[in-house]
Structure formats: C-alpha cells, structure tokens
C-alpha cells in the first residue's frame, strides 16, 4: 500500500472547504450520515402530537 501522506496533505491544505468535506470520499460518508441523522431527529417529532393528546402506540 502506497504512502499517500503528501498527496492528502496537499488536498487538505489547498482546499477552502470545511475540514469534514475535504477528503475526496467525504460525500460517501457524510450524505448517508446526514440522512440517518435527519430520520433520527424527525421521527420522534412525529409522535409529539399523539403524546400531547395522550394517545398510546398500538401493541402488536
């Protein structure tokens, strides 16, 4: 496996993007993370109206 420190150092130091977006494969990791994070944040918010009205989830 070749040592790519110099190439990566040039990429990271010459880029004006935020640090977490500088790597060439960062979109591969960040877009799925953002999607899962959005679902994890929004899903509990969908249950708030039922919680306010006192409606419990149906048991299967």
Swiss-Prot record:
It is found in: Mitochondrion inner membrane. One of its GO terms (cellular component) is mitochondrial membrane. Pathway: Energy metabolism; oxidative phosphorylation. Belongs to the cytochrome c oxidase VIIa family. It comes from Saccharomyces cerevisiae (strain ATCC 204508 / S288c). It comes from the Eukaryota. Residues 2-29 are mitochondrial matrix. Component of the cytochrome c oxidase (complex IV, CIV), a multisubunit enzyme composed of 12 subunits. The complex is composed of a catalytic core of 3 subunits COX1, COX2 and COX3, encoded in the mitochondrial DNA, and 9 supernumerary subunits COX4, COX5A (or COX5B), COX6, COX7, COX8, COX9, COX12, COX13 and COX26, which are encoded in the nuclear genome. The lineage of its organism: Eukaryota, Fungi, Dikarya, Ascomycota, Saccharomycotina. GO terms for molecular function: oxidoreductase activity. This is Cytochrome c oxidase subunit 7, mitochondrial.
